[in-house]
A protein has these predicted regions:
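ATP/Mg2+-dependent ligation/transfer catalytic cores
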Residues: 2-142
């Protein structure tokens, strides 16, 4: 059973554990969440039956041209790669829904997308660490309602 802190967030380390967690908690839908370049949350929801171990490696396709400032229509295919360490049950949805925060990658090369805020943050942390400027970074996440 995944560890559950008091604030209802779950730390899950493997895709198998996520799938087991979904079965144990009768999850019906999976909300794949990501941010646009300015930090606005976006998401796509899929039935839990579409979530497999392969999803965590292969990702779920979406149209990047629908996001402000991302891709042209002729280069719009992108992939959402769910990150298991950020899953939690949605406390507000009546339908049992698991939320997964995703990284965004190129569907051909599987390289991180340069405008993904999570990738930008990872690059910043790596730079701070490699230059000795800092050994930790803290980010404030604002959710637009």
């Amino acid at each position: 059973m995944p560890w559950r802190p008091p604030h209802q967030r779950y730390v899950v380390l493997t895709p198998k554990e996520v799938l087991a967690f979904c079965r144990e908690n009768d999850v019906k839908a999976v909300d794949l969440r990501f941010m646009d370049f300015i930090g606005q949350w976006a998401h796509t929801t899929v039935p839990v039956s579409k979530l497999t171990e392969a999803t965590f490696a292969d990702g779920v396709g979406f149209d990047g041209s629908s996001m402000r400032g991302w891709q042209r229509v002729d280069e719009s295919d992108m992939l959402l790669i769910p990150q298991t360490e950020n899953c939690f049950l949605d406390p507000f949805n009546k339908l049992p829904t698991l939320n997964l925060i995703c990284n965004i990658v190129d569907p051909i090369t599987h390289e991180d997308y340069s405008r993904d805020p999570r990738f930008i943050a990872r690059k910043a942390v790596n730079f701070l660490s490699s230059t000795g400027v800092a050994d930790a970074a803290y980010f404030l996440s604002l959710i637009h309602i």
